[in-house]
């Protein structure tokens, strides 16, 4: 039905055989531990062959399933509506319909919740958590495999030099971002694998310390004093709890050691359109977040 951007999740498959009505055999070209979790991920869910044949390339906009709700409407950047499935195998849902609204800006989500415009929201900006402490709200917190990181353009510009990349890492006060921007709801990353993957996490790793003097020394060694950096930041989006505040804090830290940083902000989909193809010829760095189902997938 069209290009599948996450096809690499299943690139190890060499054959699929039907054993009986309830059994399928997958043969892989090598051992691949995340395969079962990938099948349980949304990208691995079973779809209706009839629906694929009927809708073709439009199948993604006409989802079909066996859940408690059935697809009703999809208006881009506005809403997705699902209605109660009267034929659900496990009885009917308790509500007639559910409306999903893509409110990428965290402050907008908060305002809508406080005004009664929505009944449920995810990714509450940490600075807004206190607004939902009253008995009329229920807040659920969960630790997850979520990583916020910077994409550095190492192919050209200042960050093509390893010393300049290291300088940026020393220059950014990550503890301050965790405490002041994310209100203590995160931890400083020591590597790309989050602590939520306890079995795959190396507790012996230490993050780069905050050392602006070391950063300045590396910049001087690289001859990059006053280097101009273009920094792409999204206004909000999937996994982005407070991206502008985080980007502004990063900008201030980098400028404190001698960089000249210019932030360019984008709406989420426009941001992805700029960042996903690569930063070459456009920017030196970009803010990004990722949540994954196993420690082997992107961005690792």
In which residue ranges do the predicted regions lie?
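Periplasmic-binding protein-like
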Residues: 155, 159-197, 242-245
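Structural transition elements
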Residues: 188-221, 237-245
């Amino acid at each position: 039905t069209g290009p599948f951007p996450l096809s690499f999740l299943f690139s190890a498959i060499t054959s699929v055989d039907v054993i009986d009505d309830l059994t399928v055999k997958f043969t892989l070209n090598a051992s691949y531990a995340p395969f079962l979790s990938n099948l349980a991920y949304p990208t691995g869910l079973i779809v209706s062959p009839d629906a694929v044949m009927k809708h073709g390339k439009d199948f993604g906009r006409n989802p079909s399933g066996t859940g408690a709700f059935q697809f009703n409407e999809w208006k881009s950047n506005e809403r997705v509506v699902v209605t109660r499935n009267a034929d659900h195998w496990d009885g009917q849902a308790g509500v007639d319909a559910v409306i999903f609204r893509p409110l990428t800006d965290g402050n907008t989500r908060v305002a809508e919740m406080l005004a009664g415009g929505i009944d449920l929201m995810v990714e509450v900006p940490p600075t807004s958590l206190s607004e939902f402490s009253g008995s009329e709200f229920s807040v659920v917190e969960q630790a997850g495999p979520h990583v916020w990181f910077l994409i550095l353009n190492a192919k050209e510009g200042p960050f093509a030099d390893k010393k300049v990349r290291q300088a940026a890492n020393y220059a950014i006060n990550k503890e301050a971002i965790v405490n002041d921007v994310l209100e203590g709801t995160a931890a400083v990353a020591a590597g790309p694998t989050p602590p939520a993957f306890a079995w795959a996490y190396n507790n012996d790793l230490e993050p780069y310390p905050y050392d602006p003097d070391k950063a300045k020394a590396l910049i001087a060694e690289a001859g990059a004093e006053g280097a101009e950096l273009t920094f792409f930041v999204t206004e909000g989006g999937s996994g982005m709890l407070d991206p502008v505040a985080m980007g502004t804090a990063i900008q201030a830290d980098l400028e404190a050691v001698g960089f000249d940083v210019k932030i360019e902000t984008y709406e989420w989909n426009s941001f992805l359109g700029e960042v996903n193809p690569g930063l070459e010829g456009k920017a030196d760095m970009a803010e990004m977040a990722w949540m994954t189902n196993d420690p082997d997938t992107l961005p690792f």
